[in-house]
């Protein structure tokens, strides 16, 4: 459990105009916001932009937040909407990002190449999933959210969350099994 005021208290203080309180909320939820935006968007820079736009929109709408409800789903719903809006606005890209590979010395070039290949395949497999499955995988596996929390955020029943997670993992497993067969 983190120390200091809880999210509801910080949101109340932010609604009263205390920008430092909102800054604490940003610090607490920035990682989750970026990861969820990344599940919707193809480019890391776009995900960062969407997360920032989501925080700005949340700051502007903080007085509409219901402190009886958890803060993170309210915020991430805004971030997802911002990511979807950004995706619609940026239908054509002229540049592509090149992810950095291993920077620290240690692994051999062959090991680094294998890790980069696996990372590329995993990113490609995630990108090939439907948006809702990507969001479910990110929230469940990367953020540790419960099925009910994810369902509440996305407006779907728990059983649908479980089903989406199952189908997403199966698709990822098939993609990665193909990679292992190629490497053997």
Identify the meaning behind each predicted range.
Residues 33, 37, 62, 66, ...:
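Hydrophobic-face residues of short alpha-helical interaction/recognition segments
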Residues 49-56, 69-81:
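Structural recognition of an alpha-helix C-terminal capping motif at a helix-to-coil junction
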Residues 101-127:
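Acidic, proline/glycine-rich intrinsically disordered inter-domain spacer in sigma factors
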């Amino acid at each position: 459990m983190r120390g200091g005021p809880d999210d509801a208290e910080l949101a109340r203080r932010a609604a009263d105009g205390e920008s430092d309180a909102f800054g604490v909320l940003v610090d607490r939820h920035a990682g989750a916001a970026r990861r969820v935006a990344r599940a919707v968007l193809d480019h890391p820079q776009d995900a960062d932009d969407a997360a920032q736009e989501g925080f700005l929109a949340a700051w502007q709408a903080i007085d509409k937040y219901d402190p009886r409800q958890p803060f993170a789903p309210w915020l991430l719903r805004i971030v997802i909407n911002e990511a979807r809006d950004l995706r619609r606005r940026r239908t054509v890209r002229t540049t592509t990002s090149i992810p950095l590979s291993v920077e620290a010395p240690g692994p051999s070039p062959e090991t680094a190449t294998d890790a980069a290949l696996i990372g590329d395949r995993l990113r490609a497999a995630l990108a090939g999933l439907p948006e809702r499955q990507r969001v479910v995988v990110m929230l469940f596996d990367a953020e540790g959210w419960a099925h009910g929390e994810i369902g509440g955020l996305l407006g779907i029943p728990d059983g649908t969350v479980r089903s989406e997670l199952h189908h997403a993992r199966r698709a990822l497993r098939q993609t990665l099994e193909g990679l292992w067969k190629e490497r053997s």
